[in-house]
């Protein structure tokens, strides 16, 4: 492993300007990420329970085709339903027993949509189709008959791809603002996952934060549920009320920053632009830590729906996040990690690992942190599943 630890790293807070975007939990692309990851979790847990292993699969290819509903005050029904198409590849049987793949996919997607978009009548207005295949040139790869057909369980897992993963910690104020403003509209449910606080507000909230020197310009797009409003005056009063509360929330969290808020609201049937034709796809939305931070390096790897046993873009996305946070907590200095791994290499021995911190740190202690997480080995798969690390989240309201 080529490991380099250097100091002199500066995060975007040192620049004279920043641009940070947050696509809310109800945004079509964020919905696609969430559905893909929910399927991956439910499929993996089903197979672990039934077979004791996770067979080969990847669900990181999902498309949402928006429906057709005409927006008007007082609400409206769908003329054409929303359609969700499951792609990717997966084992449809394991050890000669069938796996109810489409049932798992549909149930997981329905569960996810019900939490994020409670105003969406999934049963009547969403169609599901699975095009998930088991095509491959490898014998028994997607239909393992014995443990020998799952080499990652017999040996040290090998990387499935040549890829780069990037993470960093902590977030800048601009990045935190993007998450906490959307998070104002959410609370935690009994499973510690975000769920809407307000019945009349949808989930397709867009937040853009632009910092110019010490001035923060914030733009918020609010999706209103049309059936709860009779006219523009009601809508304006409702949004104005929340904007004032958001301002107070920001002032409570950040005592000495100068900011302004501009906003726009629009009508939806269920709370998302998938109501009127917009498409969603895995990997087109938020990046590391749930934001699109324009002055951060990032990778095109999309972890949502990827196999949590040996996919570089999943396992090392988790490890990069975890290690970056722990290094920051250990030394109280900003940290950035860039990891590169080659296909066929040992999964827990990256080809290159570059760790950058702002201040000098004890390199032996950093190495101890890295090795401890690497030595967790296959236990990282269980951690990814149990923590639901890649299920889209936000900084829920705690005011």
Swiss-Prot record:
Pfam families: AdoMet_Synthase (PF01941). Disulfide bonds: none annotated. PANTHER family: S-ADENOSYLMETHIONINE SYNTHASE. Belongs to the AdoMet synthetase 2 family. This is Uncharacterized protein SPy_0538/M5005_Spy0445. It comes from Streptococcus pyogenes serotype M1.
């Amino acid at each position: 492993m080529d490991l380099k630890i250097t100091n002199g790293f500066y995060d975007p807070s040192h620049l004279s300007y920043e641009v940070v975007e947050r696509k809310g939990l109800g945004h079509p692309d964020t919905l696609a990420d969430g559905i893909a990851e929910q399927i991956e979790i439910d499929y993996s847990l089903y197979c672990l329970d039934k077979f004791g292993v996770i067979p080969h699969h990847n669900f990181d290819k999902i498309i949402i085709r928006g429906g057709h509903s005409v927006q008007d005050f007082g609400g409206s029904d769908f003329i054409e339903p929303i359609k969700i198409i499951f792609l990717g590849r997966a084992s449809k049987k394991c050890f000669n027993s069938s796996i109810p793949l489409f049932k798992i996919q549909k149930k997981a997607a329905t569960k996810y949509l019900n939490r994020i978009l409670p105003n969406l009548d999934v049963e009547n207005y969403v169609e599901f189709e699975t095009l998930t295949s088991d095509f491959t040139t490898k014998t028994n790869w997607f239909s393992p008959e014995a443990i020998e057909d799952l080499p990652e369980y017999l040996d040290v897992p090998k990387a499935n791809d040549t890829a780069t993963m990037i993470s960093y910690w902590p977030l800048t104020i601009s990045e935190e603002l993007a998450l906490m403003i959307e998070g104002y509209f959410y609370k935690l449910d009994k499973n510690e996952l975000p769920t809407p606080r307000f019945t009349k507000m949808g989930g397709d909230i867009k937040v853009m934060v632009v910092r110019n020197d010490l001035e923060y310009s914030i733009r918020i797009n609010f999706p209103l549920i049309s059936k709860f409003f009779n006219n523009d005056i009601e809508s304006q009063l409702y949004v104005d009320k929340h904007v004032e509360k958001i301002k107070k929330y920001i002032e409570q969290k950040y005592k000495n920053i100068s900011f302004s808020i501009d906003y726009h609201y629009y009508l939806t049937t269920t709370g998302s632009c998938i109501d009127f034709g917009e498409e969603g796809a895995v990997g087109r939305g938020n990046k590391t830590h749930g934001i699109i931070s324009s002055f951060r390096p990032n990778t095109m790897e999309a972890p949502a729906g990827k196999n949590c046993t040996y996919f570089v873009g999943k396992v090392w996305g988790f490890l990069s996040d975890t290690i970056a946070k722990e290094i920051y907590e250990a030394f109280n200095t900003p940290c950035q990690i860039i990891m590169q791994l080659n296909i066929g290499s040992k999964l827990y021995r990256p080809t290159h690992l570059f760790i950058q911190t702002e201040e000098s740190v004890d390199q032996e202690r950093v190495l101890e942190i890295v090795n401890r997480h690497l030595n967790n080995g296959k236990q990282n798969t269980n951690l990814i599943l149990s923590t639901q690390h890649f299920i889209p989240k936000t900084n829920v309201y705690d005011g």
